Amino acid sequence: MTSVKLLKKPLKFRFSVRKSDRSQSKVSIVGAAVCALALLPSCGDDSVGQSSESFSTMADVHTNPEVIASTAEIDQLLIEQDPNGNWMASIFDSDSVLLERGSGALPAISQSGATSPGMRSAYYGDLHVHTEYSFDGYAMGTQATPYDAYRFARGEAITNPGGFDMQLSRPLDFYAVTDHAMFLGLAKASAETVTDFSKNSFATPYHGLNDADNYGTGFVSMMRRLATFAGFLPNAVSGIRSGEIDRDEVLGVIRSAWEDIIVAADEFNDPGNFTTFVAYEYTASTMDMGNLHRNVIFKGSDKLPREPFSRFHSVNPEDLWNWMDGLRAMGVESMSIPHNSNGSNGQMFKLEDWAGNPLDDAYAEQRMRNEPVVEITQVKGTSETHPLLSNRDEFAGFEIMPYRVATNALSALNGSYVREALLNGLSLEQSGVTNPYKFGFIGSSDTHSGAAAIEEDNYVSKLGLLSSEAAQRGSVPYTGLDAQTFYWGSRVLAMTNPSPRGGAAYSKVNGEVYINGATPTFGASGLAAAWAEENTRESLYEAFRRKEVFATSGPRIKVRFFAGADLDQTMLETADGIDRAYAQGVTMGGDVALSKEDTRAPKFLIMASADPSSAPLQRLQVIKGWINAMGETREEVIDVACAGGATVDSKTRRCPDNGAFVDISTCAINPETGAAQLSTLWSDPDFDPSVRSFYYARVIENPTCRWSTWDAIRAGVDPRPDLAKTLQERAWSSPINVIPAEG
């Protein structure tokens, strides 16, 4: 008899609207107005009654003529929306004054930590978390403080703006609050009338935004949030540039919030048990909303800048690196981690610098010095690759979010995905230029409620009040009068008040009204994982720096990846095998440098373990990229180990179907078809010692229910037909590069 496994209890959280909001009518026109003025992250139009619509959430939207035409219209609106250049303005001078704190000094690695590399443990965490100090988080109803965020990461329950508890099934090992540096804390200071800044006339429209009588999903509350999100940033910039708002007073608010973030990180940092990092998000973008966001992570907290460097110091990421280099010269070590390259419209990994010059050694060396790691997966999609870039990779369509961040305009593919960047880095090396794209991989969440939403059956997205109900997440339809008002109201507003964020916010799928655009494409992802001697700032940071890190889409899959000509099968079988692999090879993030005397093909030692709370593993893969004899980039996906001891097909280089299934009515799975562990010693049969190449491991689970299917089950409705019902969670190791001998 086939056994089934319910991954987790289907009712992980409760929905209970606050009493103060129950008296408010959910007048559905709110959704339309919210979309038109950009409160929702994305808005788009769909044809009525189709199961696969023009604004599909699938990866094929880049070939859809209607979406392409809409993108052209949005691009024109983006050009017209900011005639005074407020969005790209620099309104603050770069500041390098340090806070000398002393108490935040890094402890030495303890005697109880690992004494050899082989004893390193895998630690899991999130380096991308927003709280009430982020302007958008506060506008979405978030009142979680940095202290609340750290309590959540340690396993405690905190309250979602929708009124229900959020709690992880297991605590995390490390966490970093990364609030937006741009106007850090200013939305909160404007809204809360006990602050001095709230006395400014600029702040008056935002007074009491998150007071108890204006807290919920009702009409009045949502309209005020609309005004905050749509007008806050441009009005603040315009006010500072005109002199209406005192620049120094704003800097005072920013510095006060920054100090509180630092204090919270130090208060919850518990070396050996739970690690926090002082951090923030640098939220730059191009005029057409090409995403250039980075999270800046500080190694310690004994010396820190008195204010974070934001887009309002400069929108040029190279200026951020200059600032970081300057701090490094004063003894302040940090790194920046790019994220959501998928929404960068080709800007994150382009082949020219900010000024339009070809990339050179100086650019590459500075970028790698400051950005050794990239965030490859998070709630706003996975940035590994895209089916149109990797058409022979049948797993390339995983949790694709195809739009630029905060718009419904398509994001260009070239320059936006990590695997292509790795390949372009090889091409640059081949031409004699230092590789600027030689990075390690992590995942993180980008939650805006203080709570990482990384579990499919426990997912409430990232948008606070705007995603606290399943219909707001796009997984279940609106019904009755709500549905008709949302649907037709959004169309009227889209026609009468075109928004650079996109068109109508709601669409019909098989006759049912759903939220449209990017929100349904969001995923319950991801986690950063590091192989470190112990759970301390110093040990974890050094793991990030040497790129001995890996990413997961949420489950705590574990993966090791080594390369070296002298690795052997016994390393998989003996107690000292890992120590010997470290001694005789390199691990993820490293280089295999061939010499004229030794051009032997490296062997790859790969080990993966399933998360006991998730599904078993289905397959272990190696992704290879290289430059061929014609100087062209090539890639290949190779299955190297299969669940159940099955053999990889020598022609297709794929594992056979292992019979894994999901019961969509209950989300039950058949766990006996998968593996708790997969490991192999693999050699590339096509290895050419004369070419540049990279390899990384990808671990694929058996299928499980996507979060949207869990939502549908709870609501007692069928899963949304244009969303994937299941997915295959995964992990990615950082790459290992193979460098040919010179001459």
Regions found by a protein language model. Give the residues of each.
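Long, charge-dense tracts
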Residues: 297-298
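Low-complexity, serine/threonine/proline-enriched polar segments
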Residues: 202-239, 649-654, 664-667
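N-terminal secretory signal peptides that target proteins for export/translocation
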Residues: 1-24
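C-terminal functional module detector
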Residues: 55-146, 150-153, 157-207, 247-250, ...
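Bacterial signal peptide processing site
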Residues: 44-46
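C-terminal motif of bacterial Sec signal peptides marking the signal peptidase cleavage site
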Residues: 39-42
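Sec-dependent N-terminal signal peptides
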Residues: 22-35
